[in-house]
Amino acid sequence: MSNGTKVKKRDGRIESLDLDKMHLMVEEACTGLAGVSASQVEMKSGIQFYDGITTGEIQEILIRSASDLISLDNPNYQFVAARLLLFGVQKQVFNTRWKDSEIYPPLGDIVLRNIDHGVYDKDILNYYEKEEIDQCNSFIRHNRDLTFTYAGLQQIVDKYLVQDRSTNEVFETPQFMYMMISATLFAKYPTVSYTHLTLPTNREV
């Protein structure tokens, strides 16, 4: 459903405002949380739509609305606000719609793309084979990002995620960040010489 308002997408395209998509996004942010209401978030936002409003502005208004609803009686709005913030981060990093956020690109693709962007050091490829990067990817649990509170996720986005500070474009999600920090720290770790190896055995305990 559209009210005729034109919105500016992150990539610069102009499209008709899809109110249904906005409603679904807020509802998704509230899914599984007790004591929260998607309609309350939308009403609290008091969004004044105008031609040319950006999707980023709409996202920020909704995040602020959910944040303003956080109280001792309604603490779960901190997770609603965090999820709305996360949807925006995922949109930038995955380049996909929020509702397709479970279609995650593999770590290897993120590494190569961010090397091309100049935000990851290409030297990391000298220490890890593709198979090892794929194995690292298998350890990532993206749904862990849904456990952040709003304050916690905002701190990570503002201070720790790799991004272009001039445009605020973000290049990684928290789970990708954690994995890349670990991979970078242990890239030169002399596992064999220190004999710090864990080998699987068939011994019953």
Question: What do these predicted ranges mean?
Answer:
Residues 1-197, 203:
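Extended catalytic cores of very large enzyme megasubunits
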